[in-house]
Structure formats: structure tokens, C-alpha cells
Amino acid sequence: MSSLSGKVQTVLGLVEPSKLGRTLTHEHLAMTFDCCYCPPPPCQEAISKEPIVMKNLYWIQKNAYSHKENLQLNQETEAIKEELLYFKANGGGALVENTTTGISRDTQTLKRLAEETGVHIISGAGFYVDATHSSETRAMSVEQLTDVLMNEILHGADGTSIKCGIIGEIGCSWPLTESERKVLQATAHAQAQLGCPVIIHPGRSSRAPFQIIRILQEAGADISKTVMSHLDRTILDKKELLEFAQLGCYLEYDLFGTELLHYQLGPDIDMPDDNKRIRRVRLLVEEGCEDRILVAHDIHTKTRLMKYGGHGYSHILTNVVPKMLLRGITENVLDKILIENPKQWLTFK
């Protein structure tokens, strides 16, 4: 049993799980996302280089990955601080920051934000998708990768003494690469030793979550302490979703606020809107999965911040929750989704 057993590890240290309150389990506060830059068509190249102002805001919102400035969330720390204070004023208590190695994790900024806002912030250990892996990462053995993950939780990340409280988001592509497979195996090994929470970013195929769970299981992971992110863009078929739900992991709908005609990172995917997400959450509740549902926004670009006319980190609490109540999801179930389920997941075994 780990010395962390029964606690949640935030960037400010260990806290009692009961202190968290309403928790968003998949967000970003300080990161860069250049790895997913999508060059615009030649006829739109000029607007892609303009600053973020009202006249081009709609274009940037709909072409988020074709505007380089939009991908630099780490430039907006003061705006994010204001948003976290607003989140807290609207009943928020904690936020899981999913930025890992490869997309500019900054634990020192996370610590400062936690100190200045009073929001509990949990940082993620590990590696993002293969496209961000360094040659050193690719050369590591599973054992060496396991050591890295454990060190970031037990001793500190980014050359600091600030410790991560989860492993993830662990990035997976489709098809999965050999380097990503090793990271998944290392994740399972570290989790088996530490009893820590794990969260996964699956590739953009409905088969990806199934494959990932199988690899984790074979390597000794605790699936009951593991979250599968981005189900709203990954498993769209109802029958397939219910089949996946039987595998026992947490089921995360974490793109609330994202409503797109064209999803740049997966052009074949018809991105659902928030009403569809709510219907999926209600379906999972009706099927007896209410103890394993999590929700978030996965904010990772500037134009999703309130400063730039976006929905911000309080959208679920201020807009989505009232609509969920209207659609028959009870207060008790919402407390499970927002408080109890995150608490259970984030608590070390």
C-alpha cells in the first residue's frame, strides 16, 4: 500500500478527498498545442495570421487548430486565474490539469494558480501522443518509463518538487504506435505499485478505447481507477458505447462547450453538441453507470476562454447542469458525477 493511500495529491500537497467539492476531471491551464496545428487552405492563410479580435473570432473558433496564437494557452495565465476565481464563485472546487510531457506542462504555474485562487489543482504525470515524444522517450524501456512516471508522482515533475496526482492524460494515436504502447504498459506498472488514478486520451477510432483497456489489463492496470477520455468524439454508436461501458473504467464526456460543424482533428467525426452529450450521459445513467460518469470541457485553446468570448471553465456548472436537471438527471446523480465520482477516482488506493 502506498503512503499516499486514502489521499488526493494536489500541486500544493496531499488533501482529504472530502475537500475537493465539484470537480472537472479533464482541463488544461498551461500548455501549448502546436503538435496539432493544421495549416489553413491558401485562401485563408491571411486570416490565420491575424490577432484574435472580434472580426475574426468566429473563424478562429471554427478553425481552432489553424491559428497558431490560439494554441498558446500558456500565454493566458492571468485570464485563467480570473476564470478559476469565477469557477470557484459558481460552486467549483477542484480541477484536474491533464497536461503532460510533450505539450508544455508547467507545474510551477499550476502551483501559483492554486495558491492564488483556492481551487484544488491536480497535475498529470506522463506523456502525450507519439508526435510529441522525444527521441529519448522513444528509446526508453518500459521499466525506464515506469520510473519516470513514479518519480513525477513521488518526487516531483519538471525539475521541481511539485508532485503529480494522476498519470495522464496518456496520449494514444490511431493506430497506436510502439512508443505509445510502451507508455501504456509503464502506466499500468506504475499504477499497480502506487494505486494512483490514470486517465487516457484515446485515438480517434471507436476501436481505440477497447484496445487501450486490453493493453492496460494485460499489463496489470486497475481499470476501476482508470478514465477513458473524449468518449463524446470517440464512441458515437449507442450499442458500442454500452458494450464499452461494461469494461469497468470511468466514462468521461469532456468536450462540453465544443459544438462544431467541422472537427479539424477528425474530419469524418460528426462532433456532437451539448444536448447530445446530455442525452448520452442520461443513457449511461439509465443503464446503471452513474457511478462511473465524469464530465469536463478539455479547454486547450484561447478562444474557449471567456476572455475571448468562449464558454470558459464554468460552463458545465452554470449552463449544462440546469439543462441536465431539465432532462431528468437528478440532483443526487449530478452530485455523483461532479463530486463523488471524481473523489473516488482521484483518491489513491
UniProtKB/Swiss-Prot annotation:
Main location: cytoplasm
Reactions catalysed according to its record: N-acetyltaurine + H2O = taurine + acetate; N-propanoyltaurine + H2O = propanoate + taurine; N-acetyl-L-methionine + H2O = L-methionine + acetate; N-acetyl-L-isoleucine + H2O = L-isoleucine + acetate
Record EC number: 3.1.-.-
GO MF entries: N-acetyltaurine hydrolase activity; zinc ion binding
Keywords for this protein: Cytoplasm, Hydrolase, Metal-binding
Residue positions binding a divalent metal cation 1: H26, H28, E169, D298
A cellular-component GO term for this protein: cytosol
BP GO terms, sorted: catabolic process; epithelial cell differentiation; regulation of appetite; taurine metabolic process
Class in the EC hierarchy, top level: hydrolase
Keyword Metal-binding: yes
Binding residues annotated for a divalent metal cation 2, in chain numbering: E169, H201, H230
Location of the protein in the cell: Cytoplasm, Cytosol
InterPro entries named in the record: AryldialkylPase_Zn-BS, Metal_Hydrolase, Phosphotriesterase
Free-text remark on how the cofactor is bound: Binds 2 divalent metal cations per subunit.
Cofactor(s) the protein needs: a divalent metal cation
Family membership noted in the UniProt record: Belongs to the metallo-dependent hydrolases superfamily. Phosphotriesterase family.
Reported function: N-acetyltaurine hydrolase that regulates feeding by catalyzing the hydrolysis of N-acetyltaurine into taurine and acetate. N-acetyltaurine has anorexigenic and anti-obesity effects that are dependent on GFRAL receptor and GDF15. PTER also acts on other N-acetyl amino acids (Met, Ile, Leu, Val) and N-propionyltaurine, but at lower rates.
Full protein name: N-acetyltaurine hydrolase
Organism: Homo sapiens (Human)
Top-level taxonomy: Eukaryota, Metazoa, Chordata, Craniata, Vertebrata
Gene that produces this protein: PTER
